Amino acid sequence: VPGTAAIANAIFDATGVRFRQPPFTPDVVRAALNPPPAELARPPRRRKGGLATFGAVLAGVVGVAGAIIGLRPAVEPVVHTDPSIYTAVTIERGRQLAAAGDCAVCHTAPGGNPNAGGRAMATPFGTVYTTNLTPDPETGIGHWSFSAFQRAMREGISRDGKHLYPAFPYTAFTRISDDDLMALYAYLMTQPPVRAQVPETRLAFPFGVRPLMAVWNALYLDPGPAPTDAARSAQWNRGAYLVNGVGHCAACHSPRNMVGAEQGGRRYLGGAMVDGWEAPSLTAQSHAPVPWTEGALYQYLRHGHTEQHGMATGPMGPVVKELATLPAADVRAMAHYLASFQSAASPQQAAATAQVLVNRAETRNALLASPAQRLFDSACGACHRDGNGLAQTGRNIPLALNSNLYSEHPDNLLRVVLEGISEPATSELGFMPTFRHSLDDRQIAELAGYMRQRFAPGRPPWRDLEAAAKRIRQNPSTH
């Protein structure tokens, strides 16, 4: 644990007790968070009342120590560096890294200047506002040295010594190499400075006590660049570096525990809810009706759609826009790495499965004559026709292949119906109107239920669709 000597000295000054081994090491804390199965109940042994007192004092000491170890020194400010010291090659490399990391996606407020911060990010602990990444000396990072920038990316510590919250995914960025961090720093420092004071992040107690993040980091942060896997190919390692490092895919696609840390193991990339959208599993646990192949993953990440799964909408739309500016080899490496978590289906097998699903949906049409079908025909038929994917305006994937219809959660489908698609990942994908003002919650629920029954007949009906439609209507997304 960083600052062990300082903690021990502080405890000695306060209590007169000298600890040779602090009682709050990461192993001890992990053991407390994950206790072993309880043994059979035994009659309690009588202890002196002082044991409870000692436990209370120890708990207090741990809390104080957490605050002590959270104090980090500030890095001295520097005069804004002359941008001409960086080569065009370095700056372009930094631009690509910023695109892979979607820096502008999170650090740009709606209608604001790129990277000037201020976007509100809802978390279970409160709203986090993204910071100004432009080289403005007063409100941005203009006074940040490279060492300050590196510390923030590797350790989650701001230039002034304050802890950053893991809504800024430094647990992934810590894996970025020194050379790439320097290139990213060079790119950011050569962008136009924007004076923009962002709102202050205030989280509920105790999450708003930033020094306590030192304990969180001791448990969940593994600082330093990630090593390569010698047993894997160069392409696989490049993909792993981009996905798990600057791309921080797990920040959205892995579920988090009760204190906001990404879960690994079988839950790695296993899907999660982010900003009201479902970020689906990127592994073989995916609810997609057609297995993802390496080619389909590349097509989706590069162009924002695949004929066997659907289109990138919601938060993935801006991600695809950024990935489209990367070298094709990098996107292929990401697809290659992600494909290693999928079932081994060939492109021919995937195509055959897709055709079966489309044919099944067409034959079920006559069996489902109902008011909901008439609602679908009037609201959706102009573009989607009979759900068979005939293109009217832009790309149109058969609804029987749309992954959202096979999910356990109706949220993504309901959001698209209510909010439409006003900013597609690419212009060729086309737009979709919003039905927020033309359909009420009951109609939205009937429409979603019909689409689930017809186009994903093997899946159980969604429950409480009207309540879900009302909830989503009242909580619009920021993407």
Sequence positions of predicted segments:
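Cofactor-binding beta-sheet edge motifs in enzyme active sites
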Residues: 1-69
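Hydrophobic, well-ordered secondary-structure elements that form the walls
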Residues: 7, 11, 16, 383, ...
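Ser/Thr/Pro/Gly-rich low-complexity linker/stalk segments immediately outside membranes or between
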Residues: 69-93
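Flexible coil segments in periplasmic/lumen-exposed cytochrome c-class electron-transfer proteins
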Residues: 76-81, 108-126, 159-240, 244-245, ...
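Short extracytoplasmic
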Residues: 86-121
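Aromatic- and charge-enriched surface segment that lines or borders ligand/interaction sites
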Residues: 139-157, 161, 174, 290-294
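C-terminal structural cap/anchor segments
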Residues: 371-409
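Extended, polar beta-sheet/loop recognition surfaces of beta-rich domains
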Residues: 399-442, 446
